[in-house]
Amino acid sequence: MTARDRNRRWAVRGAVHRAVAVATTFPLVAHLGDRIAIGREPAATVPFFNLWSLPWTAQRLPHLLHGWWDAPIFWPARGTYANSELQPLTGLAFALLRPLIGPVAAYGVILLLALVANGAVT
């Protein structure tokens, strides 16, 4: 197999994964800046918590994550953020995207990118 064939195969796989990500989250792409995907859950607890935790992580990044474990959502308890689903790399991506497209759209783009990346490595 030549390098050109491998590149073509990766391009096709990438297109398929992008299409599947868009299809499984439809109509997210049409409402990227004003809606969040909640899937088939009856309550949006996880997406809303993620939409809170990503800005928290982004806020702590300039401080080298100092105080990250003491998230104000769990106040007055200290260190309890460690019991959550920590997403430092996702928080970094959110910190870069949020100023450009807003928090809700950044969350949607990160969700789509995560689905595409998940498909690419399986």
Where are these regions (language model features)?
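Membrane-interface coil-to-helix junctions
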Residues: V22-N118
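Start-transfer (signal-anchor) and selected internal transmembrane alpha helices
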Residues: M1-A30
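Transmembrane alpha-helical segments of multipass membrane enzymes and assembly factors
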Residues: V121-T122
